[in-house]
Amino acid sequence: MNLKPLNDRVLVKRLESEEKTAGGLYIPDTAKEKPSRGEVVAVGPGKHTDDGKLIPMAVKAGDTVLFNKYAGTEVKLDGVEHLVMREDDILAVITGETGRK
């Protein structure tokens, strides 16, 4: 199934959180929080101003982003959990080695 976000909305696939802490301790599934990091899958065209001008999106498909853990609406696409959120809910784009899968 395909989903095309409208206006300034973004479709994000959550990236899995770490299984182990920096100190080497394993985190059980019951103690894990939902990750607040994800990969942008699709973006809408952007937001329109009151006079009709289009403000383009700052993120693009493939970007790794950091977002508020309460952001967005959860949707399942082909059995995989995604979030639909406004671009304003995205806190930062992660670049470099940290952002790679």
From Swiss-Prot:
Positions in coiled-coil regions: none
Alphabetical keyword list: Chaperone, Cytoplasm
Signal peptide limits: none
GO function terms (MF aspect): ATP binding; metal ion binding; protein folding chaperone; protein-folding chaperone binding; unfolded protein binding
UniProt similarity note: Belongs to the GroES chaperonin family.
Role played: Together with the chaperonin GroEL, plays an essential role in assisting protein folding. The GroEL-GroES system forms a nano-cage that allows encapsulation of the non-native substrate proteins and provides a physical environment optimized to promote and accelerate protein folding. GroES binds to the apical surface of the GroEL ring, thereby capping the opening of the GroEL channel.
Protein name as annotated: Co-chaperonin GroES
